[in-house]
Amino acid sequence: MRIGFDNEKYITMQADRIHQRISEFGGKLYLEFGGKLLDDNHASRILPGFAPDAKAQMLQQLAHEAEVVFAINANDIENGKRRSDIGVTYADDVLRLMDIFRARGLAIGGVVITQYSGQPKAKAYRARLENMGIAVYRHYPIEGYPSNIDLIVSAEGYGKNEYVKTTHPLVVVTAPGPGSGKLAVCLSQLYNENARGVRAGYAKFETFPVWNLPLKHPVNVAYEAATADLGDNNIIDPYHLEAHGEVTVNYNRDVEAFPVLKAMMEKIAGTSPYQSPTDMGVNMVGNCIIDDAVCQEASKAEIVRRWFRAAEKLERTGMGERELTKINLLMKDVNVDQNFSPAHAACLHKAEETGKLAGAMVMPDGTIITGKTSELLGAPASLLLNALKYVVGIEKKTFIVSDEVLRPICTLKENNFKLARTSLCADEMLIALSISSITNPLAGKAVDATQLLRGCDAYFSSIIPSDDESIYHKLGINVCCEPIFEQGHFFHQ
C-alpha cells in the first residue's frame, strides 16, 4: 500500500497542539472529542497510513495528564439506542469504551447522563454504574436551549447541573454517538469551574473536515459523502475569514451554531477566546499528509464506495434517494464515476460471461482477481478463495479445499436446512478451508493470509447476501455491489 499520511508525526504533533491549548487556558482544558476515537476506518481509508486507533494512540501520549468523561443522553438510554456499526446499545458502549481506555492507561472521570428527567431506565443505569464504583452525574434539560442564553448560563441553568469532579489538566469529553450532549457538558463544566474560581478552557477535536485543505479537496469531499445522509455540507468559515483574513473549511452546523456558542462563552467568562469555529479546533491532520496525490486517490475511491453503499441502501429499503443524489454531485466535483475501480468493470464482464453473480477484487499489487458462482461456491466465497490463493502464490487451478469437503455442507443445507441457496457462503468456505489445513499445508497458508487482503476493494455484479458482506467487512475488505438484486427473487437477505 502506498502511504500518504505520517501516523507517527501526527501522534506527536497532535499531542503537542493539545498541550499548547491547555497552557493557553492556564492548565485546565475540556476537549470535546468528535468522531470515532477507535476504529476510525474512514480516516484510515482516505489517509493511507493513518492508523484506525491513531487518536487513541495520541491520547496515550497524554495519559499522565488526561482523564475521560463520557456523555450519554438519558433518552437514548430509555429508548435502547444502538450503534449502527457494532450493534451494541449506547449504554453498554460506554462501559466497553471505559475498558478500552483503562487498558490504555487513561483515567476515567465518570459518566454524565444528559437530558436527565428521571427516566426509569436512566435511573436504573445510574444505579448500575454507581454499584460498579463509577462516578455518575446528572445534567438536566434547560428550557429554551440553546437560544435562551440568560437562563442557560445562570444558577437556574448550568448551575443546576451536577458538577463533574475532575483532577487532571485535560478532560476529554466523549460519547458513544451523536446527540449525547458533549458540548453541553463542556460548557456546563466551564460555568461551574468559573463559579468556583477555576480558570478553564474549551476546545474541539474533529478530524474532518480538514480545516487547512481546500473546500473541494477529495479528503474533504469524502467526508461530505460519508455524512450525506445528514444533509449537511462543508463550507468556508466566514467568521475566520473576517477575523483573520484566512480561508478555512468547517462544518456548516458548527458555523451556524458559533454565534450562540460565542455568546455563551462571553456570558460565562466575560469574553470569548475564539473568533471563529476554526479557532476552537486543534486538528493537525492536514499537517501530516506526506503524499497528497495518494490521499486524493484514496479519497476518490472512498467517494465511489459511498455511492455504491447508498445505492444498495436505496435498493434494499427504498430510502436514501436524496443521499444518493448528493453523492452523485460529489463524484462530479472530483471527476470520478462508478468505473473508478477496475474491479467494477471486471466483475460485470465476468457476470456477463457466466450468466451468474460474479465478483472481482483488486489485489495489493494491483492485479484483478475474479470469482464466479458455481454449484459448490457462491461468488463471494469463490472470489475470496481465489484472492487468498493469489496472495500466497498458489496456482488458481490448485485445489486446496476438496469437493469432498465442500459437497456434504451443500447437501446439509439442501436436505436438512431446506435452503434454496446451497452453495457455500464466504464464512462457510473459510471454515472448510480451516478444516482442510489439518491435512493440507497450502490451505493453512491461505487461511493465514486473510490479513493480506485488508484494504482491498471487491465489487460484485449484484447485491450479495448480508452474511457474505459481513464476513468481507470483518476481514477489512471494502465491498461494493451493483445496486440490483439477482433476478427471479422477491425476498433477499
List the model feature ranges, each with a label.
Residues 376-392:
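A short, polar/charged loop-to-alpha-helix boundary motif
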Residues 185:
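Hydrophobic positions on the alpha1 helix immediately C-terminal to the Walker A/P-loop
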Residues 392-393, 414:
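Flexible, solvent-exposed loop/hinge segments and secondary-structure transition points
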